[in-house]
Amino acid sequence: MEPLIGMGVLALIGVAATIAGASEDLESDVGSQSNPNSQVQLAPQMMFPHRIFNKAVSGEPPSNALMCSVGAAVATVLISEFTLSPLFALVLGALIAACVHGTFAVTSTMGRAASQSRFKQPVYLDMIRSHTPVIMGYSFITTFCILVVSYLMTVVLGHPFPLTMLAFIWGITVGAIGSSTGDVHYGAEREFQQFEFGSGLNASNSGNIVRYGESGVRNGYDNSWFCAKFGGPVTGMAFGMTVFLGSWVTTVFDPAVSISRGWISVVAGVIIVLILIFWNWKIEVKARNAYGPYKEDKTEEASA
């Protein structure tokens, strides 16, 4: 393959991965999945009923791995057995995966709310009807972009793994990045805005999430709107960089050409990792110097 064509395909893969990362994080924010959902689940037990979609089908990595694997399996069958166009096959695969994910989301949130009836947590059918299409829409975008990435890597770049296996791996990866990157913005900032930033979460405040929004009762739409400003884009950038930089070294220094090029790609990958570690350290040091540690106010100091 010509180097320019390879870099062009790699750029397209990076764009698709960036979109997939952003949509995955916003999907988890609308449905309240992964780590922050433990507080949403705990809120009714602490006498704080809410109108937040409480699905948490599972952790984000296995949830997205299942979603992407289903879409890839359907697309593979349509391409190989029915000779359907790859584009239409990927779209139909993502659509079926979104329907499967939507089914799990509905049964999950209804089951969780019903199990908390003793704590006076209602099952809001209007909330379920309004949020489920949004969750399915985000999951469709995520799955389709992951399928595009996997298909291009398999067919164009000649990756040895089959489409379904690659989609499974990238599904786990995008879920893990969304859980560790974007969910911090939702859980640490959006759920506990009534407490001073940087103060941490006292055990006595567990479950005391923000239940009222800028206008009316807060729901998943509000959380997605807030996280689209920072958490979603950062997740997209993180996943996009992971996919792009991970494939860039082997595209520029193709191991198939010679063994020496293969070792050069390994060295280039290590250098990139070291640069990112140093960059992350500099950002953390700058943030600590700019904002400093959390300081107790006078009333807390007096009581201590």
Curated annotation (Swiss-Prot):
Pathway: One-carbon metabolism; methanogenesis from CO(2); methyl-coenzyme M from 5,10-methylene-5,6,7,8-tetrahydromethanopterin: step 2/2
Top-tier EC class: translocase
A single MF term (Gene Ontology): tetrahydromethanopterin S-methyltransferase activity
GO cellular component, one term: cytoplasm
Membrane topology: Multi-pass membrane protein
Localization annotation: Cell membrane
Zinc recorded as keyword: no
Catalytic activity: 5-methyl-5,6,7,8-tetrahydromethanopterin + coenzyme M + 2 Na(+)(in) = 5,6,7,8-tetrahydromethanopterin + methyl-coenzyme M + 2 Na(+)(out)
GO biological process, alphabetically ordered: methanogenesis, from carbon dioxide; methylation; one-carbon metabolic process
Keywords, in A-Z order: Cell membrane, Membrane, Methanogenesis, Methyltransferase, One-carbon metabolism, Transferase, Translocase, Transmembrane, Transmembrane helix
Transmembrane segments: 3-23, 86-106, 131-151, 152-172, 233-253, 263-283
Enzyme Commission number: 7.2.1.4
InterPro entries: MeTrfase_E
Subunit structure: The complex is composed of 8 subunits; MtrA, MtrB, MtrC, MtrD, MtrE, MtrF, MtrG and MtrH.
HAMAP family with a match to the protein in the record: MtrE (MF_01098)
Described function: Part of a complex that catalyzes the formation of methyl-coenzyme M and tetrahydromethanopterin from coenzyme M and methyl-tetrahydromethanopterin. This is an energy-conserving, sodium-ion translocating step.
Similarity comment: family membership: Belongs to the MtrE family.
Protein name: Tetrahydromethanopterin S-methyltransferase subunit E
This protein's encoding gene: mtrE
